[in-house]
């Protein structure tokens, strides 16, 4: 999936992002604003994970968005 589609629908997807990564606050989600690199950094900080792991989790989220048709 093209990340631009997620970024463009960020407001609608924030709830799904929050379900996936519950440690992210509303302020952080607003700051991320769909920017993938910012999400990577926030996941690293909030969960104490390496960049590679954050990237892996985001790819899984992208696949879930496409599979469950959260983004058209």
Give residue ranges: language-model regions:
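Intrinsically disordered, low-complexity, hydrophilic segments
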Residues: 1-72
């Amino acid at each position: 999936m093209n990340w631009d589609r997620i970024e463009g629908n960020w407001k609608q997807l924030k709830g799904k992002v929050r379900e996936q990564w519950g440690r992210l606050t509303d302020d952080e989600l607003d700051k991320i604003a769909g920017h993938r690199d910012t999400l990577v950094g926030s996941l690293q900080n909030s969960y104490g994970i390496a960049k590679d792991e954050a990237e892996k989790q985001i790819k899984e989220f992208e696949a879930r968005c496409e599979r469950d048709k959260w983004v058209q």
